[in-house]
From Swiss-Prot:
Keywords of the record: ATP-binding, Chaperone, Cytoplasm, Isomerase, Nucleotide-binding
Gene Ontology cellular-component terms listed: cytoplasm
Keyword ATP-binding: yes
EC number: 5.6.1.7
InterPro entries per the UniProt record, alphabetical: Chaperonin_Cpn60_CS (IPR018370), Cpn60/GroEL (IPR001844), Cpn60/GroEL/TCP-1 (IPR002423), GroEL-like_apical_dom_sf (IPR027409), GROEL-like_equatorial_sf (IPR027413), TCP-1-like_intermed_sf (IPR027410)
Phylogenetic classification of the source organism: Bacteria, Bacillati, Actinomycetota, Actinomycetes, Mycobacteriales
Protein known as: Chaperonin GroEL 1
GO biological process terms, semicolon-separated: protein refolding
Subcellular location per the Swiss-Prot or TrEMBL entry: Cytoplasm
Residues the record lists as binding ATP: T29, L30, G31, P32, D86, G87, T88, T89, T90, G413, D494
GO molecular function: ATP binding; ATP-dependent protein folding chaperone; isomerase activity; unfolded protein binding
Entry's family note: Belongs to the chaperonin (HSP60) family.
Organism: Mycolicibacterium paratuberculosis (strain ATCC BAA-968 / K-10)
Catalytic activity: ATP + H2O + a folded polypeptide = ADP + phosphate + an unfolded polypeptide
Main location: cytoplasm
Length: 538
């Protein structure tokens, strides 16, 4: 494949054009009066969304150089979404403002490396300042407030608040589609842990990037599974029963994993392989916990149970299992209730007895997993499109609530960012030359999110930025009510983790764009005849 290469200013300009195209599409969704974006789908009706990252994921540009810029900003949005579940639009708008301000200076002869260093230092300073000014979040109402801001829906916000309070900070909140029109909250017995599928080929729900197994059987294995002859007899028995299979083992590799993947692709057997969490004795103990929850047995050569000899009687079961790339949730395990209750009692006794803090902490983690249960938010809506959008916004709200409990909250509406400019004064004084200019670029960019929140609400962005800069900390524009005031009291808040991720991720991408000297892309294939582009000739 031959390549086309662009250099310095031309390369940067093209990348900037791509950054702008993507950011302009995403920024209309920012704020409580953010607009919707309609996405045409290859199959089925169009999707309507006001979630920045969903819009960003859909965009690929025709010009290969511009597309580089768009993909860079897309990575900012996705990264921020992965860490904090929200704040994607803020990150995108910040990145756009940084690229614009930075490239202006580079074109005027500033040193991009020094500029980039200044931008990074500024991002760190703002991130620290945000952390320092955060208000901790606890209690159902506070959590509900965060979730309400994220989902723009009070009822959903309160559901998330209730769910989080019930299952605790480490508890699992799972979001499912309901078969009715109502959105409701259920608490079920369930266990979640931080290990995801071993291969993306196991995914069954491509939009959510999850493998969902309904009414599966569960194989728990103490050691590695790599040889196919060991696993095959079990796979054949499970395939006959027609049930999906979840395998949790120290590791699944080689032929065994390859066979599971091939069967998943061919749809002959719905299976998902997951590594067991933790190490050594903790892993052993946790597998035993899972065995009790699911009503299965841990297959362990040490106790004379060999994988190739056992039948389906050692398998556990559950109502539903959801596996993503990072975690696994087992809902309503088939184990006996009293066995689980006894195990919980036993763990509590061990916690009382132990004198090692580390052991106590780990035992408490296991206890929380066993006793905490799973909150299931069942989302209902009138149409397929509305259901999708609603489910997305509940997932974002849960992520935002978790982030808020972790690091606290700051005033929302773009004002915390704008007011974090004060943290840059000292830094600016200690730097000189192009690094100091980098700090200026960053200070300028911090007004961008507020500018677009105000613009989307039909106000003059520049006026709003000027006004909020004069207000005391924690005060700003409430774009919902179109008034200025105390945002935290009004419940216009953002999790600090979300805002910080947006700041740090946008700075790292801007720095990349500024220091780009050469861009290399594939040469587009020439069309053999012009059927493909017939519509240009009318």
């Amino acid at each position: 494949m031959s390549k086309i290469i662009e250099y310095d200013e031309t390369a940067r300009r093209a990348i900037e054009a791509g950054v702008n195209t993507l950011a302009d599409a995403v920024r209309v969704t920012l704020g409580p009066r953010g607009r919707h974006v309609v996405l045409a789908k290859a199959f089925g009706g169009p999707a309507v969304t006001n979630d920045g990252v969903t819009v960003a994921r859909e965009i690929d540009l025709e010009d290969p150089f511009e597309n580089l810029g768009a993909q860079l900003v897309k990575s900012v949005a996705t990264k921020t979404n992965d860490v904090a579940g929200d704040g994607t639009t803020t990150a995108t708008v910040l990145a756009q403002a940084l690229v614009k301000g930075g490239l202006r200076l580079v074109a005027a002869g500033a040193n991009p490396i020094e500029l980039g260093a200044g931008i990074s230092k500024a991002a760190d300073a703002v991130s620290e300042a945000l952390l320092a000014s955060a208000t901790p979040v606890s209690g159902k109402d506070a959590i509900a407030q965060v979730a309400t801001v994220s989902s723009r829906d009070q009822v959903l916000g309160e559901l998330v608040g209730e769910a989080m309070t019930k299952v605790g900070v480490d508890g699992v909140v799972s979001v499912e589609e309901s078969s009715t029109l109502n959105t409701e909250l259920e608490f079920t017995e369930g266990v979640g842990f931080d290990k995801g599928f071993l291969s993306a080929y196991f995914v069954t729900d491509f939009d959510a990037q999850q493998a969902v197994l309904d009414d599966p059987v569960i194989l728990l294995h103490q050691e590695k599974i790599s040889s196919l002859p060991d696993l095959l007899p079990m796979l054949e028995k499970v395939a006959e029963s027609g049930k999906p299979l979840l395998i949790i083992a120290e590791d699944i590799e080689g032929e065994a994993l390859a066979t599971l993947v091939v069967n998943s692709i061919r749809k002959t057997l719905k299976a998902v392989a997951v590594k067991a969490p933790f190490f050594g004795d903790r892993r052993k103990a946790f597998l035993e916990d899972l065995a009790i929850v699911t009503g299965g047995q841990v297959i362990n050569p040490d106790t004379g149970l060999l994988l190739r000899e056992v039948g389906t009687e050692v398998l556990g079961s559950a109502r539903r299992v959801v596996v993503s790339k990072d975690d696994t949730i087992i809902v309503d395990g088939g184990g006996a209730k009293d066995a689980v209750a006894n195990r919980i009692k036993q763990l509590r006794a061990e916690i009382e007895k132990t004198d090692s803090d580390w052991d106590r902490e780990k035992l408490q983690e296991r206890l929380a997993k066993l006793a905490g249960g799973v909150a299931v938010i069942k989302v209902g809506a009138a149409t397929e499109t509305a259901l999708k959008e609603r489910k997305e916004s509940v997932e974002d709200a849960v992520a935002a609530a978790k982030a808020a409990v972790e690091e606290g909250i700051v005033a929302g509406g773009g004002s915390a960012l704008l007011q974090a400019r004060k943290a840059l004064d000292e830094l600016r004084g200690s730097l000189s030359g192009d690094q100091a200019l980098g700090v200026d670029v960053f200070a300028e960019a911090l007004g961008a999110p507020l500018y677009w929140i105000a613009s989307n609400a039909g106000l003059d962005g520049a006026v709003a930025v000027h006004k909020v800069a004069e207000l005391p900390a924690g005060h700003g524009l409430n774009a919902e009510k179109l008034s200025y005031g105390d945002l935290i009291a009004d419940g216009v808040i953002d999790p600090v983790k979300v805002t910080r991720s947006a700041v740090l991720n946008s700075a790292s991408v801007a720095r990349m764009v500024l220091t780009t000297e050469t861009a290399v892309v594939d040469k587009p294939a020439e069309e053999a005849d012009d059927h493909g582009h017939g519509h240009h000739h009318h």
